[in-house]
Amino acid sequence: MDIEEKKSLTSSWFRELRDMFCEEFVDIDGGSFERKNWDHKFEGGGEMSLMKGDVFEKVGVNISTVSGKFDNDFKSEVKGTEQAPNYWASGISLVAHMQSPKVPAFHFNTRYIVTGDSVSYTHLTLPTKRIV
């Protein structure tokens, strides 16, 4: 599988995860998500999915797929960008705040980042079964 196939598979997988998470939150709460698209200043963008409900004060399930160039201050911190500062990234972020102050909030995110050095990575394994 070449890097372009991996990027496409990754973006699709994050969209599927977003849809699964949103479905589970709706099943629990009965509310509905509002979606809003946003654009990245270079290329790409994302979609915010927000819900306010009875169980959850606020839930956000956000996905993004963006590309661009790291600035000079940051590119020295990221492997593979010293010679070519280009990047491509896709990810998902989830934040949930409950109505009850006795139930803690939670947050997680994960990203798949491609840099000039990424072509040396040959394995990308994504789950094939529903994990929620």
Describe each PLM feature range:
Residues 2-79:
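Gly/Pro-rich turn-and-neighbor structural signature
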Residues 47-121:
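Internal mixed beta-strand/loop scaffold within catalytic domains of large alpha/beta enzymes
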Residues 122-128:
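Conserved small/polar residues in nucleotide/adenosyl-binding loops
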